[in-house]
Amino acid sequence: MAEYGQTARHVAPAELVATGKFTVPYAVNLTLSNTGGLFSNDLYKVKDTNGDVVFKVKAAFFSSRHLLLDAKGTPLLTMKPKVRRRRGTRRVFRGESTSPNDLLFSVRKSKMFQRKDNFDVVLATSTDEAAPCDFKIIVGSKEYTIYIGETDHEIIAQMNRKTECCARDRLEITVNQNVDFAFIVSLIVILEEIKPSRRSAM
């Protein structure tokens, strides 16, 4: 498990997913597209500004799990609903594991009763579920904004939604420097998967 510093600027370390591989000293622009088909477990593809594939997201057959893979198909993260907890909660594990020892972070709705669907991200190092969140996601009509901590003072990533032909959405993601962009992509995928049932399921 990665070690996390005490200051807000060190809460999103290079080692959250893979040692420094997905963290760079400059802002990163990515595009996430839905690639899901009726008989396919392919859900999303993430490309960089050169059009090269950076990540893929697949659904595990006969399971509620989703896998974030690198361009070579290596599993990086497993995203899974949290059983017997309030609806909308997701837990994210290292690789293909779902062991508590490999838990990296959880995503949950900020409050049970709120006008906007905002979400909290809590790192696995926070054992108290009532503790303040490590990151907050503010959801707009066509954008997500991700902040460090409880306040909205320090943005680490943003997503803007563009609608293309055949009603498919293209999500344009900007990740600030020194922020793990595999981590950011996993958060956006989780919100996209929660979205269809957000009003009725939470």
Predicted stretch roles:
Residues A2-R65, A71-T74, R87, T98-M202:
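Low-complexity or membrane-interfacial segments used for flexible interactions
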